[in-house]
């Protein structure tokens, strides 16, 4: 258990570290931006599809005080970056800090109102839209933060008093029911994770506890028609790292049993079917679905290890895109490489999430591990029916982040639509919001929305469409 004494020792050890050491996630492309900007009537090269009416909003860490002591990329103060589009125009770009108490204590803007779960209330990992509301999310601690349409106002939310425990940075919408599913964990509770379901109205209807060991870090999950998939893999809470001063105390743990849990969607912990898998780590899944023979397929980005070689950020060897077949009868998982190219941030056409599907897209990673995780690499597209891979390369010095798929229409065929994401230009310290044709990935962008400042690499973004008239 993390006691006040442990926190005091951790703070002391951190204070003894070198405050001037270079930190890959506080310098260069990751250097925090200082100014909150509002830029209207953005310049555009190409044509924004007229059907796009809404906002693209991404969030990531942007430390208000860039102190390398004990710092990890995953714990920086949250900042949202959004672009609003309507009628073929880019109306505005805004970036705003998420108004946490931690930010206020560091000298930043006043904290937002609303309930807190703990003293650490930084939110920096995902932005979603659900039940007509916009939420910024983080895992393992804080409640969600609700944002207004213009990103100008923030309020912490326990979803009307219905969220009793932690939430996730990676809930998934079931397109057939309209509910959000998440697997959540809490750094203060090392023996339990939870399956949380948020209904169509934005209220929690289920928080089902599942016993685990060692406090695993479970960033993502998957669903099928039958199951919720729990990725219980060997990155776990490390008291030694915390006592040593780490702000993100999770490390590779070879003693932790690697397994995938199949939890029936309305089942209890007693119903989980645990299936062993060779040790690996997974941040993100592409999709999962049930097979007629009773097995479950899940496609994902796999790593050989994670957080085994240094405390600053992701540092494991990417194994590319893998397909795992989870066999509840044998209680085993078979692994198959779909593409060994290093990659991350897989996204499907999310109208088909939890169902058999054909298309997925991902962000390439450098062929050699980069100290700051990122580098020149393409956006990949996969046709899983034919095995064909396509790619879009933005050119030297252009660093893309996660790209999200947006269907052309609600009833469009799978994969018929656009990809959207931020691309950093290292030379000019500017950013483009790029819009690509998902079915012709190698073609020039349909539109580049020019943002005259660098948006630091972040985590997750989403297209948040305006409500239909």
Curated annotation (Swiss-Prot):
InterPro entries: Carotenoid_Oase
Cofactor note: Binds 1 Fe(2+) ion per subunit.
Activity dependence on pH, as recorded: Optimum pH is 8.0.
One GO BP annotation of this record: carotene catabolic process
Alphabetical list of Pfam families matching this protein: RPE65
GO-annotated molecular function: carotenoid dioxygenase activity; metal ion binding
The protein's Enzyme Commission number: 1.13.11.82
Thermal dependence, as annotated: Optimum temperature is 45 degrees Celsius.
UniProt-annotated binding residues for Fe cation: 170, 219, 284, 460
Effect of residue 460 to A: Loss of activity. Strong decrease in iron content
Cofactor(s) for this UniProt protein: Fe(2+)
Keywords assigned: Dioxygenase, Iron, Metal-binding, Oxidoreductase, Plasmid
Reaction catalyzed: all-trans-8'-apo-beta-carotenal + O2 = 2,6-dimethyldeca-2,4,6,8-tetraenedial + 13-apo-beta-carotenone
Highest taxon in the source lineage: Bacteria
EC class of the enzyme, as a word: oxidoreductase
General function of this protein: Catalyzes the conversion of 8'-apo-beta-carotenal to 13-apo-beta-carotenone and C12-dialdehyde. Also has weak activity with 4'-apo-beta-carotenal and gamma-carotene.
Quaternary structure and interacting proteins, as annotated: Monomer.
Family recorded in the similarity comment: Belongs to the carotenoid oxygenase family.
Name by which UniProt lists this protein: 8'-apo-carotenoid 13,14-cleaving dioxygenase
